[in-house]
């Protein structure tokens, strides 16, 4: 058997470009992207297929100190990424210090599997700073191969992909060869709506929100979607809806445009807002939304 396959798990601090990298590798927007921390909440697989190999990339939440139960569940996803990886990608950006979480950083420097340290956002750097950063990270993570990249500009991404293929273990594919991800359609509807909330609202509002798609009906030409935005308090519900529903309408229009590109079909979407009190600290609700796996 000459076929290769393996899990390549991407970890790092918030906003270092993990989701941008996976989307670039896969060639599809599977992970939502905003400038806000904690945009990625779940562990999302993106699958790259070739006749001779299959790479299962795993995007993970940025590493933080949990402040409530939802964030604890998010960090559990990161822990699971250490346990099943064949190759670990530790992603940092120019000027960044190592992970604040000592436990996770120790797991990286003592990993028994290949570690690729990707020094991202080099388009915002100069040659002198870049060389200094490479030396700094070589000293901090001596077990890692270092690749300066720009995930946004797609610089050096192909070289990283080639190195991953070199390092993959011999294995049959883990997923069908036409698979792109492990997530269902409704997950991407939920995430697209949540991305628009992250982009259109400030302060605590985006972090108090969860999205659930109650209806996804697809026929030959159109997909009919009914989704619900969950918030924790009535005041948040009013802010999400906005004056005469204008803010919610804007979210719906933006989400529909993205979903029509993603599914390549006409989309009819209805979005409602409900209060789900303190869902971020409710074990039952976290399980319902796919966070608490315990």
Question: Which residues fall in each region the model found?
Answer:
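Conserved G1/Walker A P-loop phosphate-binding module
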Residues: 1-76, 80-82
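Conserved glycine(s) of the Walker
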Residues: 17, 156, 247
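Active-site phosphate-binding and catalytic loops of NTP-dependent enzymes
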Residues: 31-33, 100, 172-176, 199-211
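Catalytic P-loop NTPase motifs of RecA-like helicase/translocase cores
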Residues: 40, 63-65, 97-98, 125-126, ...
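Conserved C-terminal guanine-recognition region of P-loop GTPase G domains, centered on the G4
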Residues: 52, 76-144, 217-219
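Active-site glycine-centered loops adjacent to acidic/histidine catalytic or metal-binding residues
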Residues: 59, 120, 150
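Canonical P-loop GTPase G-domain recognition
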Residues: 114, 123-181
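P-loop NTP-binding site
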Residues: 185-294
């Amino acid at each position: 058997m000459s076929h290769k396959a393996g899990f390549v798990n991407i970890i790092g601090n918030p906003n270092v470009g993990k989701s941008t990298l996976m989307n670039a590798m896969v060639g599809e927007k599977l992970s939502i992207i905003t400038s806000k921390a904690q945009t990625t909440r779940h562990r999302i697989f993106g699958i790259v297929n070739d006749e001779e190999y299959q790479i299962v990339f795993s995007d993970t939440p940025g590493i933080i100190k949990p402040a409530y139960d939802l964030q604890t569940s998010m960090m559990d996803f990161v822990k699971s990424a250490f346990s099943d990886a064949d190759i670990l990608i530790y992603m940092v950006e120019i000027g960044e210090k190592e992970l604040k979480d000592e436990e996770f950083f120790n797991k990286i420097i003592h990993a028994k599997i290949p570690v690729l340290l990707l020094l991202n956002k080099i388009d915002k750097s100069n040659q002198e700073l870049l060389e200094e950063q490479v030396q700094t990270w070589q000293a901090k993570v001596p077990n890692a191969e270092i690749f300066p990249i720009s995930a946004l500009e797609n610089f050096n991404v192909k070289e990283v992909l080639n190195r991953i293929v070199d390092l993959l273990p011999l294995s049959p594919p883990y997923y069908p060869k036409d698979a792109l991800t492990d997530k269902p359609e409704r997950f991407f509807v939920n995430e697209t709506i949540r991305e628009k909330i992250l982009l259109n609202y400030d302060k605590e509002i985006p972090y108090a929100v969860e999205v659930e798609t109650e209806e996804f009906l697809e026929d030959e030409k159109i997909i009919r979607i009914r989704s619900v935005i969950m918030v924790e308090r009535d005041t948040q519900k009013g802010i999400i809806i906005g004056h005469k529903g204008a803010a919610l309408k804007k979210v719906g229009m933006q989400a529909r445009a993205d979903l029509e590109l993603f599914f390549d079909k006409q989309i009819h979407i209805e979005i409602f807002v409900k209060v789900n009190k303190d869902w971020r600290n409710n074990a039952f609700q976290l399980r319902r939304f796919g966070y608490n796996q315990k």
